[in-house]
Amino acid sequence: MSSKLLALGALVGFLVLPLGTAPRADDHGQTKGEAGADRALRLKTLAPIPASKTNNTAGAMYSFDISFVDQKTETYYLADRSNAAVDVVDANTGTFTKQIAASPAFKGFTGNNATSGPNGVVAAFPWLFVTDANSRVVTIDVRNDKTVSDVSTGGAAGLRADELAYDPEHGTLLVINNADVPPFGTLISVDKTTGKLTVGKRITFDAAHGVDAQNGAEQPVWNPETNRFYLSIPQIGPTVSNGGVIRINPFSATVETTFPVQFCGPAGLALGPRQDLFIGCNMVFDTAGNVWDPNGTVPADARDVIIDAKTGKVDATVFGVGAGDEVWFNSGDGNYYATGSGSPERPLPALTAKGSTPAGVVDAKDQKLLQLFPTYNVPAVTTGSGQHPSGTSHSIAANSRNNLVFVPLPANNAVLSPDGKNNCLTGCVAVFEHSDEDAKVD
């Protein structure tokens, strides 16, 4: 098969779109060679996820959230709400190894993501930090899978703690309660010797505290060069097209500044080379600047955005990818990876249609879209004995040592590994391989 084609099981011959190398825009002083002729991402294998004894979504994985690769240990972690566990995959081989439960147990899927868990995961060996319903944050010692610390950020009853980021130098977590109104972040100190968590100051994301977040708060990221956290805010103020990225000073527990980002709905956030921030947009607007109507006549204008972390200047608008959730920068191949679970190219209507939806590969050096590759969405089943929630491909992470890319897929009978041995009937993590001729990007 041509390297430009990808067979995802029953999606035989489904076209992967390598978009080539366009003339360079601002390369931020980077002068390394252009990409090799073959940059296509290909499906390597599937890591099937077994149903746990506590699974409550028809015996398969449909509800899951953020994933993370610990680069030092080459271990992939996935917050799996269907199985009330963290799924673990060997990021060197792409094989499933185990599921980690918390004690007391994670909430699991409740019928509402805002009250479910686990949700966010970040690892710094030997500690795994995981968020849960009821504003819960735990530390798990991955040497023995024991829960060694358990705290609450103090949000409204039942609502979850969601995404989080970690400053390993100072031992500080920023944990986001996105479902509270207004949303807020909590600084939590980590005892790097014992894993013990100590809840610190709260940062409220409302107008009185510098940012009028009216539709939640999404992915935080730590920037060691500026010693600041950054956080994507989908909507600031009453206008749906106005979002932004805020810069947070963890030492004063304040929002220092807001970098406006329009026509995007910022969700995913990743720190790339040259102090760039890659923003995964979670809303599709049209070319007239309105929220895209799939039944209308105005074309969709899907995009992700790259800004300068120090100035907030928009360095590039990457058209043709999005909308999605989590994004990732892989220093091993110099690419950003962007989910596209809400892409205008996905099967519609979303509530009843299942099928492939494109994720994106973006060259961090050239700041151009290189490729779209298929992932998979599954709609909810709301009647009968097999009821389950919808599942969308909104989570992504990569291993910089071997450039394997990991995308969890909800349970389906359409996806099969290239060797025909692994399927996704109970949910899986799709493992993609990508050989890139570029050297690492600093």
List where the protein language model places each region:
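Bacterial N-terminal signal peptides that target proteins for export
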Residues: 1-9
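Bacterial N-terminal signal peptides
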Residues: 9-18
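Predominantly soluble domains enriched in secretory-pathway, periplasmic, or organellar proteins
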Residues: 18-442
